[in-house]
Amino acid sequence: MIRPARDGSIRPLLILFLSVLGALLLQTPSLAQAARKLPDKIPPKRTSQIQDGFGINSDLPRDPYLPWNRWWWTRMFDAGFKWIRIGQYENSSDRTSWDWIEQKRGVYSSSPELEDAVDSLVDNGMDVQVQLLYGNVMYTAHSGKLPDVSVPEPGSFHNDDRSLYSVYWPPVTPEQTDAFNKYVGWTVDHFKDRIHYWALWNEQDIGYWNPWGDAVQYGHLLTSFVDTVHKTPGAKVIYGGQADPSRDFTQRALDTCKCASGIDVYAYHTYPGYGQNMNPETMDYGAYLNESPRALRDLVTHTPRIKPDILFFDDEFNSIGTWIGSDDSVQAKYVPRGLIYNHAAGVKTFVWLLTAATDGNESDDFGIIRGLTNHDYDFTPRPVFYALQNTNALFSDTKFDPTIQVTGADVATLPRRSDFPFLSYGFRSKTGKAIVAYWLAAHSLPGNTFRTLYSTFTLKNTGIQHPVLIDVVSGDIHLLEWKQGTTDTLEALPVSDSIMAIADADYFDWPVLPEAPSSLNVTSSGNVVKLSWQVHGGDPQHVVVERREESSSARGSWQRIAELAPSAVDYSDSRVKKGQQLAYRVRATNAEGESASSNIVRIGAP
């Protein structure tokens, strides 16, 4: 404690000290202020908060293996995925497929389940691409007698299958092609206000196109597909989902099609070392021998009449923990690495798969959320789910900035010290804030056994004032300090086979919205409709119940009918008229905003 002299001589010094201190505090936020604002973990960013983000593949809900009233569907909105690719149920067809849409010759229809799923995606902020596929036995069966109806394939059906009535027989004759394009035209027009991206087929270069991928046949079908899709204003064409980065297949398909100017997106898939542990960066050096996604994109961009702004989707990517030499810890490192590696190259990545339908032929291997196996861990996230939630929060709505660089004498030694390439990329958010991602492109081993190295980095052109270190897999955030006397150099930074990121302490500038309620169920008793659901995290302060009245001619709009306490898990609606067809959903709210909505339930009032 400072005790003033009797003559008061300390007072001028105290006033001067306080004035200088105040001026310093007004100039820039102090280190202490930055530390006080810093979260311990990466705050999640929901789909509704993102304009341009990463993608996920998903089957549409289907009982009994993917029931909509379990907690899996809404988690893609909570985790901040912005794009979704639909059209397959595992390796079979789904509700958007030709054998589902046209079940009687010349009669096209959607289903309430499909309409509700699409509404859920669009209303919760997702951008949707649909694969239009496969064959239809009324037209493409390899039988001298064609059936008069199409019975959709079960979820257990999968390639390779060359039986007479397999849906993998493609439309190749003029009559078959015309029938396929009628299905395409009806579907694109029906969803024109909700879905704008349409892909032709899936992995047409392998066993999804019988008897085996045929580039010339695919090119012929692509010609009329481009014209059919573009008849609907705003609809975009995706060259759909080539399984391997074969330049020869693409070249022959485009040469046959002569429709390069009509392709809006080129899509391909990457599973480096399918079935075994190969790090994602090997997609461009070794996983495909003399082929690579980089070389494939170069071929496409140099194709005559191709659009100069053509988009590239890596719309199936994963490296699953059950593959030989891998585990869940390897997957949690590899998948974010693949996303950011592609992001720096301008490629949008779609992870395969949200949740596995275990009636398919790939068990419960691919889902970032576990599927139904009748265990207590059913529909629980794998570690990679949280790593992707962190990736989405940090890098959605960012653009690669080549002027941001990581340099330093230590950096050049990292490949020699580790035997693996060192990768670093700088990005800027939509508000101009910089974030730097770095890692060693290592072959990771099970059990988190990689030995962490340490290095000094000099960051160029970031504008970062109060640097923080972010572990993308764990989500941990730690405050850093610039090397004394510098504002761009950081010492003793950990470098490993997992993505670390450096940003400013004020990078986390988004509010945390509640997680969506899930597991909505509905029953009725007399003229009362009873609802029940589950509420989750994100500090919900209210639960809102919404209702929509259905009719044969039109779908009504959603109306809020109740606002309940955050602990509420049920509600009874007594304002029901006899014969009404009703749909319900619920969402959570807090002071920052609202969650995504739950699954939709329907019921007819008695």
Where are these regions (language model features)?
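Boundary/entry segment of secreted carbohydrate-active catalytic domains
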Residues: A35-Y89
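Substrate-binding cleft and catalytic face of glycoside hydrolase catalytic domains
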Residues: A79-N277
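Noncatalytic carbohydrate-binding groove/subsite architecture in carbohydrate-active enzymes
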Residues: A215-Y341, A345-F350
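Aromatic/acidic polysaccharide-binding cleft in carbohydrate-active enzymes
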Residues: W323-P415
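Carbohydrate-binding surface patches
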Residues: D410-G463
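C-terminal beta-strand-rich structural cap/linker in extracellular carbohydrate-active enzymes
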Residues: L479-L513
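Pro/Thr/Ser/Gly-rich low-complexity, intrinsically disordered linker/stalk tracts
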Residues: P511-D539, K578, E592-P606
